Amino acid sequence: ELAIQTGAGAPAVITFTDGPIELWNLRESEDASIFDSHLRRYLSALTGLMNNDIVTAGYIDKPFSDWLVRLLELTLATDEDLKNLREFHPLRGVTDRWIFGEEKQPLLGPGERSAVFGLQSKSEKEYKGGLSLHFFYINVSADERSPKIARVDIPRWVVDDQKKLEVLHAAILQQCRIMGSKPYPYLLHRAHEIAKVSLEEKQQVDQMLQLELRRRGGEIGDLSNKQSAKDAQGRTSF
């Protein structure tokens, strides 16, 4: 909602998610109905961003995905291998990040990004039209000797607009440059700092939980010696 309000009349508004923009699928768990409710709200929020022309992206630091590696494996497969692809992994252990950021001969130079690819997943049917999921890899390092490859997830409405894609690319690099030798979007870094819970806040939450547990007739055990020692140190954040 804040992004939508800010976007009115603004030249470009970009929102970042720490991690994939695909909501993790918990359908096989007993909380499937809860997940479905969250998914509907999430898709509605994404639709709101799309309708208000707002750029959004998920930033994955040090990704371990091997989606492109899997495509390479398909090119190596024989007709016999194709009959049992789940067991055909000649490049097992190789990640997309290694391919794009291999130190001696990285495919991506400082500040460069890959082509945009479509994302196939079990939940792709939920992300239709402008919400369909895509991704690209980007080298956020400014040092040729030390590539830093990240994956960026984006929806179709960003993919289809070259200007949005370029603005996002530039914004990611600008944010990562702020962090110097450890490139990472500064906005996400600040969000992590702000989200830290102080010792006092943690104790307040603990008290609320204990009161609710007592109200329901539950028993509250003593703190472990380890936790008591931690609390006695007066730590200010967790």
Language-model segment annotations:
Residues 1-12, 19-29, 33-238:
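Long, contiguous domain-sized segments
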